């Protein structure tokens, strides 16, 4: 949904010759959804705040294994849980881990077990608020163990990340 909203905003801005710059589009986009600004920014970045404070990061050259568990994950519910967690435990910043990881693995026992079985051998990462998990790798043979442990009702894909969003070229 968020990438669709951003794509629509960028396309209409260009098609209708509104000519808003990226900064103004991002300012409008933050009212449309937490990660819409990220998609308007259009390049590898780290988001802060509700996703509207963006800082470019180095390009990701690694290959990715994208794992899609067979569960639905509500973005709204994840933000509610994150707010509750911060109220109870205080606010901490760990730039090396997605803030939603701990919440995500508590929500589903199969995901939690998968994480426990594989996190010591692989650097598991969460995409956004979930539900996709990704692992960076160089050679597919590095993934032999984990591919055997992915539940049969989960999907997985071998990917290469784009360095810029295709909407940057509209």
Residue locations for each model-derived region?
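DPxDG-like acidic metal-binding loop motif
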Residues: 2-22
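ATP-dependent small-molecule kinase catalytic core of the GHMP/sugar-kinase superfamily
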Residues: 18-123, 136-170
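Conserved glycine-rich beta-strand-loop-beta hairpin in the small C-terminal domain of fold type I
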Residues: 131-133
């Amino acid at each position: 949904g968020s990438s669709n909203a951003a794509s629509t905003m960028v396309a209409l801005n260009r098609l209708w010759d509104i000519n808003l710059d990226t900064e103004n589009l991002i300012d409008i986009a933050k009212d449309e959804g937490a990660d819409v600004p990220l998609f308007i920014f259009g390049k590898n970045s780290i988001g802060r705040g509700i996703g509207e404070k963006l800082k470019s990061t180095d390009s990701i050259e690694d290959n990715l294994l994208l794992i899609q568990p067979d569960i639905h994950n509500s973005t709204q519910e994840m933000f509610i849980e994150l707010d509750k967690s911060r109220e109870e435990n205080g606010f901490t910043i760990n730039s090396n881990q997605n803030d939603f990881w701990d919440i995500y693995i508590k929500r589903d026992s199969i995901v939690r077990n998968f994480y426990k079985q594989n996190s010591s051998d692989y650097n598991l990462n969460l995409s956004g608020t979930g539900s996709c998990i990704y692992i960076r790798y160089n050679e597919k043979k590095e993934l032999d163990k984990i591919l055997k442990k992915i539940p049969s009702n989960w999907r997985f894909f071998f990917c290469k990340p784009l360095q810029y969003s295709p909407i940057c070229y509209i």
